[in-house]
C-alpha cells in the first residue's frame, strides 16, 4: 500500500460507525500526514507545522493536500 492508502485504511479503522465519523477521522489523519509532508518540504519543525495545519479549516487543508497529492489521489480518498 502507498502511504496515502495506509492513511485511508487507518481512518476507516478508527471510525466504523458512520460516514460522518469516517470523514472526520480521515480529515484528522490527513492533517497529521499533511503536516509531516509540509514540514519535510519546507524544512520546518514538525510540531510547529502540525500546529499550523491543525488550525486550518477543512477547505484550506484539502487545498494544501491537493497540491501535494494531486487531484486524482484526493478524489480517490475523499469520494
Curated annotation (Swiss-Prot):
The keyword Transport does not apply. Keywords: Antibiotic, Antimicrobial, Secreted, Toxin. GO terms for molecular function: toxin activity. Expressed by the venom gland. The keyword Isomerase does not apply. GO terms for biological process: defense response to bacterium. It comes from the Eukaryota. One of its GO terms (cellular component) is extracellular region. It is found in: Secreted. The mature peptide may form alpha-helices which disrupt target cell membranes. Insecticidal and antimicrobial peptide. Has insecticidal activity against larvae of flesh fly S.carnaria. Has antibacterial activity against Gram-positive bacterium B.subtilis B-501 (MIC=0.63 uM) and Gram-negative bacterium E.coli DH5alpha (MIC=2.5 uM). Belongs to the cationic peptide 06 (cytoinsectotoxin) family. This is Cytoinsectotoxin-3. It comes from Lachesana tarabaevi (Spider).
